[in-house]
């Protein structure tokens, strides 16, 4: 019996192991896996139904039509004889093919690629001093559904692209549904929502060739942002490591806009929302991201689902920055209505107000993650919007887009979107209406339905629009003068980074602009960089082989904000993946002990061996292999531990693969490549026994930063765990070319 049967390795497709032969005994459908959860069983009008959690799933032992007619065959069409034509009367064929032809709905025009999870939000109560929102009262628990996403790519695009990530949360409160529709970057490309089609058209694939997919390294994107310079601040964040997060679990979230909280007395406070991951904010490195997109395009989806399945539930604290609701809505010289600006945490600390835990995967991607509909206008009493010109347009766009994507105005009745509060809305009929409304008077006022529905007062939780005095002005198309500064916050962000992070920004700009065909676009963007930081501009220009232009704008300086840096802290390692390389030379008792130690630390151990199956010792239990040299790549693992000698697998071709390692060595070149890549990417590496020779073959000094070796897992695994808490061995990243 394999020793790791007690260790849960996530990723099983079903709750039961399949039989070798096709099952023939009739039985009910299998239940969802323990880590899965569907939408709450509530009616289209928000009433709890009391039905089982999976009551909306398929039922019965036998295959039926959509009308419940049992079928005895679904493998053959009805024909006029075995070689004759198919008959039009084949109702099963027509239903099956017709439904298949209409399975797809329009994908989101942005944020098409996403992953979701269920969870709970528990309020600390600290926000109850400034808002009457019931779900923010002390110790209130609220069900949530979260969808993470990329922005530019299509639904089938890769996860680890350089892009902004969406971070949207649906709170099912007893006062109605509240949606916090955010991103992993606190600023946006544009100030006014009328420019949203422009930035997305520029970032999407070129319309003639439909390339490139899910990336900004092309002419149309840089043509737009170099001309429309209010996009420079967001672009700077995107070129940083924030644009390639390690995981959704290690991603910060931001509400982007300034919102207004309202207390019971009507007093208002301006706030910005923040999600702070308990695991810290961590990213990939660019080479690693590129390899991942080829090896595992579903990297972020898989990571989130596997973490939840293995019990390493992701957690974020919700926090707020608070500001006085003054007439000018400015704070420390920064316009709070400008979505291209953020407020450094050193000026306005983030105050935690609650904890979100994601603890269940969806049971059906389409029904939940694809059909969920977020909208920043889904508000509850105590939370209101501001006059941010991007937010104001989103209030229209997010409602409008659901009508085409989800087939009509009744998208709130889709199970994942149903409120957990009573719904009496006087909205009737329409496509896909699933409520069965009673009464004869869906209008107000009425007497025929007894006057119901009645208007609510504040004493029973009515939403009241904040009375706001509008300054005298004229109707015009222009921004306030405070929106004119396009460079100072990009400078603030860049100069707040460590030298290593600055170097990554330089590399990102150099890569992206190097992919642009037109030199004029590269030159124009260099002019923008010159207005941000001369050293940054010079380093990127050098990489492009172009002269560095001089600044044309006198950009004001600001105090750096260390809070935006990702380097320097120590963080939990829950859910991290550790690859353990083993083979016939390994002491399998030590391999088993290593797996136990990794698992006990809350991480996921995966054994990598020359081939799949099991490693069999002369005595004692065997060890199951999760990855072979053929299927493994360093990018799947946060750390690699070498417990074997890298014996070549049967499918190794040294003559072809030697270029990946050191010619002439008696190791499988893919093992050398795996270890070498892990070293290049700053990952923790451990070794014992024959593993030391593998490090030598890869040219890795055993006293290099982030490298540990010892007699066995009892000494190596604790050091690896400590190294992982810093995410990477940052000492391996010399900041060559970083700006001062």
Feature-to-residue mapping (PLM):
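Active-site-adjacent core segments of small-molecule enzymes
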Residues: 2-585, 592-600, 604, 609-631, ...
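Catalytic nucleophile loop
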Residues: 518, 639-645, 667-697
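Short glycine-/acidic-enriched loop or helix-start segments at secondary-structure transitions
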Residues: 590, 651-654, 695-698
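Glycine-centered loop/turn motif at secondary-structure junctions
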Residues: 601-603, 682, 699
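Short gly/pro/ser/thr-enriched loop/turn and capping motifs at secondary-structure boundaries
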Residues: 612-615, 693-695, 714-715
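A short, aliphatic-rich alpha-helical micro-motif
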Residues: 634-635
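A charged, well-structured terminal subsegment
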Residues: 704-740
């Amino acid at each position: 019996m394999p020793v790791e049967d007690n260790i849960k390795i996530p990723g099983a497709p079903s709750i039961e192991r399949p039989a070798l032969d096709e099952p023939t005994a009739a039985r009910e459908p299998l239940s969802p896996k323990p880590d899965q959860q569907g939408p709450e069983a509530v009616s289209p009008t928000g009433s709890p139904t009391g039905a089982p959690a999976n009551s909306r799933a398929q039922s019965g032992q036998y295959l039926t039509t959509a009308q419940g007619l049992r079928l005895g065959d679904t493998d053959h069409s009805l024909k006029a004889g075995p070689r004759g034509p198919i008959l039009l009367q084949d109702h099963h064929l027509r239903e099956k093919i017709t439904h298949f032809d209409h399975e797809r709905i329009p994908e989101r025009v942005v944020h098409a690629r996403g992953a979701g999870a269920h969870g709970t939000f528990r309020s600390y109560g600290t926000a109850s001093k400034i808002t009457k929102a019931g779900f923010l009262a002390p110790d209130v628990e609220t069900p949530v559904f979260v969808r993470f996403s990329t922005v530019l790519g299509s639904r089938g695009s890769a996860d680890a692209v350089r892009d902004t990530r969406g971070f949207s949360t649906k709170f099912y409160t007893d006062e109605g549904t509240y949606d916090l529709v955010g991103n992993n970057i606190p600023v946006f490309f544009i100030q006014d929502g009328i420019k949203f089609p422009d930035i997305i058209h520029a970032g999407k694939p070129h319309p003639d060739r439909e390339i490139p997919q899910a990336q900004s390294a092309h002419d149309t994107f840089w043509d737009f942002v170099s001309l429309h310079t209010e996009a420079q601040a967001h672009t700077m964040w995107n070129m940083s490591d924030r644009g390639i997060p390690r995981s959704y679990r290690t991603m910060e979230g931001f509400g982007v806009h300034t919102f207004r909280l309202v207390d019971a007395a009507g007093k208002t406070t301006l706030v910005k929302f923040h999600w702070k991951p308990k695991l810290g904010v961590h990213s990939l490195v660019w080479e690693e991201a590129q390899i991942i997109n080829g090896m595992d395009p579903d990297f972020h989806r898989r990571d989130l689902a596997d973490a939840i399945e293995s019990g390493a539930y992701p957690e974020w604290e919700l926090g707020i920055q608070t500001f006085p609701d003054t007439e000018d809505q400015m704070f420390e010289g920064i316009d709070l209505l400008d979505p291209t600006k953020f407020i450094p945490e050193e000026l306005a600390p983030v105050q935690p107000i609650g904890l979100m835990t994601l603890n269940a995967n969806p049971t059906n991607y389409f029904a939940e993650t694809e059909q969920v509909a977020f909208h920043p206008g889904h508000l509850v009493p105590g939370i209101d919007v501001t006059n941010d010109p991007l937010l104001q347009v989103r209030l229209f766009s997010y409602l409008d887009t659901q009508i085409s994507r989800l087939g009509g105005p009744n998208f709130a009745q889709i199970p994942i979107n149903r409120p957990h509060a009573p719904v009496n809305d006087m909205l009737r009929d329409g496509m896909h209406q699933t409520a069965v409304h009673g009464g004869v008077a869906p209008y107000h006022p009425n007497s025929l339905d007894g006057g119901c529905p009645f208007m609510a007062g504040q004493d029973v939780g009515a939403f009241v629009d904040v009375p706001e005095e509008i300054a005298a002005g004229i109707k015009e198309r222009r921004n306030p003068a405070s929106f004119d500064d396009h460079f100072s916050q990009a400078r603030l962000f860049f100069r707040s980074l460590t030298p290593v992070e600055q170097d990554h920004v330089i590399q990102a700009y150099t890569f992206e602009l190097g992919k642009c065909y037109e030199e004029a676009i590269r030159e124009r963007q260099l002019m923008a960089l010159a207005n941000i930081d001369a050293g940054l501009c010079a380093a990127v220009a050098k990489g492009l082989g172009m002269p560095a232009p001089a600044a044309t704008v006198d950009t004001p300086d600001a105090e750096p904000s260390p809070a935006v840096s990702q380097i320097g802290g120590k963080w939990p390692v829950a859910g991290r993946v550790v690859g353990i390389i083993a083979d016939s030379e390994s002491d399998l008792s030590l391999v088993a002990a290593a797996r136990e130690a990794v698992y006990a630390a809350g991480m996921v151990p995966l054994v990598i061996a020359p081939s799949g199956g099991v490693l069999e010792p002369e005595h004692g239990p065997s060890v199951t292999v999760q990855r072979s040299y053929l299927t493994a790549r360093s990018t799947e693992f946060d750390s690699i531990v070498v417990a074997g000698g890298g014996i070549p697998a049967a499918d190794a071709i040294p003559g072809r693969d030697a270029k990946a390692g050191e010619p002439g060595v008696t190791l499988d070149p893919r093992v050398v490549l795996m270890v070498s890549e892990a070293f290049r990417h700053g990952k923790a590496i451990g070794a014992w026994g024959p593993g030391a020779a593998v490090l030598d073959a890869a040219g890795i000094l055993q006293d290099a930063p982030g490298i540990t070796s010892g007699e066995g897992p009892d000494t190596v695994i604790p050091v690896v765990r400590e190294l992982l808490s810093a995410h990477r061995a940052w000492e391996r990243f010399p900041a060559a070319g970083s700006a001062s």
